[in-house]
Amino acid sequence: MFTVKYENNNAYITVPDGIDLPHTLDCGQAFRWEEKGNGVWHGVAYGKYLELCKEADGTLALFNTTEHDFESIWRKYFDLDRDYGAVNNKLSKNEILKNAAEYSFGIRILNQEPWETLCSFIISQNNNIKRIKGIISRLCDNFGEDKGGYHAFPTAERIAECTLEDLAVLRSGFRAKYILDAAQKISSGEIDLEKLKTVSTDAARDELMKIKGVGPKVADCALLFSLCHIDAFPKDVWIKRAMQVLFGGELPDEAKPYAGIAQQYIFFYARETKLSV
């Protein structure tokens, strides 16, 4: 269990099961975080700007953070109430997953705002990280609320008011029509993202795939990174190949309740060990 203390408008968190900032913030889960230098990261989530770092003793430092913001945003965002040690012990019943978990120590699932996450992964289709971040930056700068020095991610309602001509400024190509369709379905209530947290993973996936351009991979990213479905397992070509090499294509049974965490570990492990896929 983590502990937190507040001092000089900063929050200092001791996380017994660790947090690795580069491998959590810059691994393709979220796209609005950047390293400023000297291990300090900054970004925007839930309309709030945050700077943070991990200190020499492993303490996670959140700067200029109120107790209210920590309790209402960052505690859940960084998944601090989940016992990753216990999860890793269960995964470690499989020797390959044990190695992957050890390699990936400190990677955590980010619990993000659902609309932002869905929209971001629509943008991510057939795209690279640099370009994804560029499109999202233009989306926020042009349509997000000005918070004084930074912009919040625009609401689905704001985007639903736009035309495809309005969205041309994003330079997002074919993705613009998918962004607009998603915004319209969310803002109208046709798809209720909050409700999807309470239904089965399969049912939630089917609902998200009613949006134009949303296939299983984009849906599973939204489910895992924003809708509390820790058993969602996003699959792209690369992870499918890694799964085939490591497990013959089928995730071991002990991993299935935590498939999303296992997916992050497998991806990182395969990349870092230069697994031939």
Where are these predicted regions, by residue range?
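HhH-family (HhH-GPD) DNA N-glycosylase catalytic core used in base-excision repair
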Residues: 1-277
